């Protein structure tokens, strides 16, 4: 905060607009309060006119901060849909806020590309704060090296020079927050780099910080999520240079501002018109799709503003249309541009501003405070800045760049001499200084006490509203102003009591500390300034004697004769550091002499923020206390600094005030954060010692992301990302605070300055809570039913019977217990609802009552009319909340006799019953009316009807294939004994919503016939909600308990909640309620009764109209049929029997014994007008798979593709425990069940929706229909080995550089293992693997035993290094290489010579050896055929040859058998060739596992050759697909793997005699490693030379033009290879750019026969000069990519002439 600020009333800020007279109204006359979060995290309250525009507010803020270059800054605010929206500075601020307090955030909007061009240090200081926040919040990703470098400047700015005595280890860095996730390795690197920055002032460190930060890729980029034209998720970034496009965290395109002609948006689309290129004729328009029109407009406005600010000299004026209306947006940026800001002269003295809060920490040589007489000596010793008398006053006075300026030679020599003298006097001065410090200590203590007493009296008389422009007076202001660039924010009012300050309150001590921070270089005269510094030194000495840690250090900086105090006018080397440079070498310039700052004429002392105050012993004790767990970054920071009083500490730990997902503070049920003033302990602070926070949730009912999408996009780019790190909100520990809520309140301060023992208990509780926060429970979905009706104030009763019912879904946060719903945030414990008051426009908390009997929430205030959406005081609401922990599933039960021959239940003649069950996903238990069935162990827990005890029987069988449950032996209802010949077949259907369709029949009750009089009967349909755990159903008539046979409702007479018994009619299973309210007199009538039929439906729609149940009109109730004899209520389903055309009806029955609801189907007989119950198998609602007997039940849905009805069946996988539902349709032709979708119920998202799986990606048993492999994920990762570094890199297969190159390998991995539901990673023996990228979590990664390196990607796994080599021996044949195989790339090389990454995907899978290893020689278009074809048509018909190779590998006790069957089919001629091979090998004697392995690999290769004889061009396309399946049957386990590999290659060959044309052949030897290949010079494709002894000098007899060439020889052994070698084959393929010669030969050495492959690559050009270095690099890169195992043996560069 600058010290030179003229006092002004905050209510009258500096604005360029004229303020209108205030209204006489009190609401408009009272000034508004804008609560602004500054860049250091502190809060600033600004009083301003309500009619003020945004520019007035930012002018007031910049005036208070003493900023002149204010055009780079802006204000942001939060909306329900966007957590970071820029405030329009030309509109009134009151337009964007409805509350009295305007929450705003001060931020940098336009990032200058060159920070050194900023004119003032204070502007750079605030830019540094913004960049620091961007790094810590994840918007600016950095690498390890960048984090270390920037962190070293952070440490230099805060702590000064490195001191080996005080900083022997990296312990002094433990309080620094350098990176979002920092490690010990990073701190070591920071410590090493910190040593190299000796002598840099804080201002210099700031400029170094910015000069390195501007080089980051995401510096100043404003990201917006979008989709491209193909629907792929991308991010659009707006920056100073133009528009950037990102996809999968990589920048894939850039549109510079000069290349863009026009930007526009329409609805949710954003368009840019591109200027045509040099060879383009028309303009092109590119469109992007955004989430909504608001997002599109936000992106458009950002582009307009950035383009105007950085590219234009002045803003574009808004054109005024006179005659024609303007349909587009007239928005234009009206602020000053960068050019105007740069050209505006600054005619003031550089402001002096504080980078400190208070105190001094005298532990560094460069920061020691001495007497004023010794100030100059300390300056010489601690800084590389030279004496003022030796400066050149006019040498580059305006240079602020860290680039080293040239010095005059004479000045350099003198500087060198002075440096030598300075070193000689160093030891002597240190001893003198220590002696003086001891003498001045007592004097400083007395002076400090007197100054503090006077300051306290002055601070007590300050008005709180003066804080905006007067930082020297108010303690409130000192809590907000004056911090170092990397400080942790403002100091709270609750300071930490010191040992000798026990008689002072924390508040008084904080005032003292706040005043101490304002005595530094405040623009006074030199004498007064020296006095202030002397007083600061004495106060520092006083602090040195106490145990209160000082929070500042002194530093020196240069002041010129004009009073310019900019500390950045020192020249230094760019970049700031070098790894190979001596740390002491920074004292010298380029020629070894000391650097000089030409503008510095005088040394001054300032105060810099000390980031790790206090003695080391106290810090170590604090670290030991917090070792068991970690509090939130805010709490831990203040505890380490001792800045929390015991009272504040107890309040913070006892109240879970911080929401884990929002920045806002929750009080009770989330009181509006804007309406409640925040205390100091709740104010946000972005700092290096504070973790990032998420964004606050907005208005109720809007489900928006809890974090910034920009942060989500950049999250994975963070250095050393933690395992399972899901976003910034993870740093918060609300659970930890909640865990500490029960701790005792710490007592008053003791003599030692510590709290009562309760503080230790609170810290321990917070640590335990932090551990609980690490395992944060997942949010769960709950069902909500709301009954809205009239509220009677006299009886305080809500008329629920005549109310409207609405069903919805809410999200329960287990950490807070709050439920986020469309109505607002509900606290079920306190009975409150936080919702938006439509009358006041504010969020308010409405108090309700929680019914102790039903648990429902009754609200009589804050209730909105469902029709209008406005609050209505005459309405009341009953909110019923039901958890959805386990899914409710339909059960189809067939009870019949057991066939003694097959042991199966007769499903055709059995009785069918439809009921419900609750399936526990974790244990596999199925709760049914027949008992609790364990689907894994086959146990049945049921209640014995005689004894009433739980009996466990094992007469349950679960079919592992179909998942059907069979109960053998059931109780005969007649004899009440178990009949072993009877059984039940239970089939689990689909998961349904616990929504109840309540159909009631009310009227005069006939007690004799036990029915309702048909004349007075009235039918009504409504909704209900079913709680399967409690067995209760909430309806508008009350809460029905099906187990206890009771109903709980609100008595209309007394208005109290009462519980009455209900009667369940045994014949119909319907509920009979007597003594109901008669609608005629609106009073209870003993003769008036109501019969209720409950049906739990799978959809909340009417079967005929598909309308929601709550909207079914009374006219639809006429279709309901009531049985006149039994009053059974039948509801039409809308379906008919296709054979008899009878209408289908449905009813329900409640089992009186178990309370389970049973669904009954029936058909209406048109003759008798009666409904017949369907007790047998109904083919319209149930389908049976003929092969497996699996039962599928109708869902009521239809297939979107075919329109046929869908049937469902649910199954529990016996091995993995996964629960999945198969949705299928019946093929009308074959009658077979065809699976359409698979829903994985056991894997749900945050809202409870099951994961949907495509059946085509699953392996389904054709017999039983069981999904054998459905949760394994097949991932396509494209990798290649970097020929320079040897590392595996991932490439984009669509990149033109790789699409046609032979170096591209499509690597398919099969990752098998349990999927972590939180992180989504697959757990394997090599670590937790990300299925999307193949990256392995570093925390669980293993080390390669051979290389010793950590395996961080699945492709880096070499199974042979882990002893997993295949125990198979086969006979191999060496086949001469062909031209076709050369086009195929590296596939022709044996596995011994080349190990592709695809082997790593199937480590112990034997198909890796046989998947695509069998390559057959296919000669397409021989040279003779080509020569003869020249006389025919210019263009020939394409030749297509399809080769199918099937390999079956069987390993058993007898050994290994390998069968190969091959079919070569010429699709043009119809010629088919078959061939078979068989290889056998004996079993390995060491293999005693007894495993039986069957591996099948089917490879399909389609080669298409298109020959253009007129152009002598041939285009060959090769597509290959290999599907390898391995099944391992082991006594202990069964495993199956499937590997699919696809390779596509396209090559264009120009053959014939083109080599004879010499006139227009271009030299294209670079940039196209796989581009056009010409034919050999003699017309032959393959040249073979036999029986040559020296393979290194084998040449081919080709003739061609004499060229300048570079030859690269690749081989596996040394150049001096000795031995007898026999040439097997040679091949030479030439083009106009290169010649590749491949030699295959075998040699015998020491009785061992080896096969070697050697390649010679010659780079050539047709007579043109060649770039040897470039050509050589390309040759090595291509050859190494083709065969990574080969090495370069010899490089020859020759000059050949004709």
UniProtKB/Swiss-Prot annotation:
Biased composition (Low complexity): 12-27, 449-461, 1561-1571
Major site of localization recorded for this protein: other
Phosphoserine: modified positions: 471, 474, 478, 566, 659, 687, 697, 1398, 1401-1402, 1590
Expression (tissue specificity): At onset of germ band retraction, expression is seen in epidermis, hindgut and foregut. During retraction, expression extends to tracheal branches and salivary glands.
Bias-annotated ranges (Basic and acidic residues): 374-448, 499-514, 579-589, 618-627, 1509-1532
Disulfide topology: none
C-terminal (CTD): region residues: 1286-1698
Keywords (A to Z) from UniProt: Cell junction, Developmental protein, Phosphoprotein
Residues bearing the modification Phosphothreonine: 689, 1407
Keyword Phosphoprotein listed: yes
Gene Ontology biological-process entries: actomyosin structure organization; adult somatic muscle development; cell adhesion involved in heart morphogenesis; cell-cell junction organization; dorsal closure; embryo development ending in birth or egg hatching; establishment of glial blood-brain barrier; heart process
Database matches in PROSITE patterns: FERM_2, FERM_3
Protein name as it appears in the record: Protein 4.1 homolog
Lineage start: Eukaryota, Metazoa, Ecdysozoa, Arthropoda, Hexapoda
